[in-house]
């Protein structure tokens, strides 16, 4: 699963996820893309599950790009532990998602197949998405 090899700090503040995606909001590598239309956070497990669903559906033809990376650690305290006594341990990694962010891209497959694959992937994700096609200038 995806996670940083090393980080400057082990744990981060919770933070806020506001605004729209101002980078990574266009299809730049492939021809088709899966773009987020709602805000939320994707875990490393969700990103990997969606990637597997797409890869298996297109039977490993074409190319798939993952445009998001989980670089924010989420901590949890063990069950039945009283409040206080410091911040919990890092349990998993997430990627904060803003509306407009392109999550995945695909190339080398027909549009109908790409739509089906992205629909399977979207079912694995916790944000609402839409299918987009690269615009040619």
Curated annotation (Swiss-Prot):
The keyword Lipid metabolism does not apply. One of its GO terms (cellular component) is cytosolic large ribosomal subunit. Pfam families: Ribosomal_L16. Disulfide bonds: none annotated. GO terms for biological process: translation. Keywords: Ribonucleoprotein, Ribosomal protein, RNA-binding, rRNA-binding, tRNA-binding. Gene3D superfamilies: Ribosomal protein L10e/L16 (3.90.1170.10). InterPro entries: Ribosomal_uL16, Ribosomal_uL16_bact-type, Ribosomal_uL16_CS, Ribosomal_uL16_dom, Ribosomal_uL16_sf. Binds 23S rRNA and is also seen to make contacts with the A and possibly P site tRNAs. HAMAP family: Ribosomal_uL16. Part of the 50S ribosomal subunit. This is Large ribosomal subunit protein uL16.
